[in-house]
Amino acid sequence: LLLLNDLDSGGYMIQIKSKLDCCGCTACASSCPKSAITMVPDEEGFLYPKIDMRRCIECGACERACPILNKKTVISEKTEGYIIRIKDNKILYESTSGGAFTALADYILEQNGIVYGAGYDNNMRVVCKRATTKQQLQEMRGSKFVQSDLGNIFQDIKKELKEGTTILFSGTPCQVAGLLSFLRKKPDNLLCVDFVCRGVPSPGLWDNYVKYMENKYSSKIVGARFKHKTYGYHTSTMKIDFANGKTYYGSGRVDPYMKAFVREISSRPSCAACAFKGIERPSDITVFDCYEYSKITGRKDDNRGYSSIFVHTEKGGKILEAIKSHIEIQEEDVNSLVTENGVMVCNSAKPHPRRAEFYLLAEHYPIDEALNKIEPITLKDKIIEKSKRFLFKTGLITVARHLNKGKKVEVVENK
């Protein structure tokens, strides 16, 4: 699978026969005892491993750490399904769905533990961050539709686990698999929380979008929410805050970054054949949306958001039990949650046929111009977007949502 080719620079590049076989989890780089492997962006902006053979001792640690080369069959202790929602209304509003991550993370912090999850650096790049206080958790809250840069986080986590610290690591399924493959075993003081993932766009494309928006609004971005509940949970929207006090809202109809994402134009190549799909997972808890709350439970949906979760391990079950006073919770059939909310639990999204062309364009054009050549934002899109505020205030947005419900994600079945 891994080939070494000499570069003009004198280094060597780990090349993957197919980019479907590298998820960018950093397990190989983190495992190298000589720090011979670095993660470098390709032409699309996704990180891939590069090896310096002047440092390499050919020990094979990198190959042993790869979660795709060494994929393990996962047999969960007993996966249970639940719908939950945090009781704190402020946190619920700030959360993408039902606030499950915050409820779990708060508990870990209360046990003097440490939480790792996606946040922003000073340049609005999405990176894995470390939280020891509830204040630091705030920027981890909410979805980030960008592949986060893990840096040396795996090594930091390994050190803290050895010291006996309780750790919650939250990430994509491939990041969780990468961490566990790097560690070689799952310590008792590690709680892994993954989520049902549609795919991860590249950090390079996100940089393109940030520059485009900052030029358009003549101001630096100071905050970003990919699925803000401005118009309710079921009609979430991108929200961007600028240093000059302006705020932008745009859904997947009119926002170029979000439209590229929902049209399956921007995800990493390996996402098209994700190796980590399925109900049974190496994580302790899996979190995903619960859009069909009424259909599953027969109760009214107030459009403020719920989380579907799978509990895979006894450890996950004990922590769920410990946070019950902070959440609304009801047990539901696992297969019902998958059928109604979880098409992406077991399937990969089928990539857009012009995906490669889009990324070539994005190398040379701002994201809006690149997207316009592939999936133009139409006048109809703009009219519908402008009508959302009126529809939300009058309650008609619920009717519009039901009329639009027939559209489904095209998927590739993962065998």
Predicted features and spans:
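Conserved nucleotide-cofactor-binding alpha/beta core module
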Residues: 143-168, 173-192
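Immediate flanking context of iron-sulfur cluster ligation sites
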Residues: 14-22, 53-57, 164-167, 254-269, ...
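Gly/Ser/Thr-rich loops at beta-strand to alpha-helix junctions
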Residues: 96-99, 122, 169-179, 199-201
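Iron-sulfur cluster-binding cysteine motifs and their immediate structural context
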Residues: 12-16, 27-50, 60-78, 284-285
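Local cysteine-cluster metal-coordination motifs and their immediate loop/turn environment
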Residues: 20-35, 57-69, 172-178, 267-279
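Long, compositionally biased charged/polar accessory segments in the mid-to-C-terminal portions
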Residues: 111-114, 214, 219-415
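Short, flexible loop segments at boundaries between secondary-structure elements
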Residues: 191-212
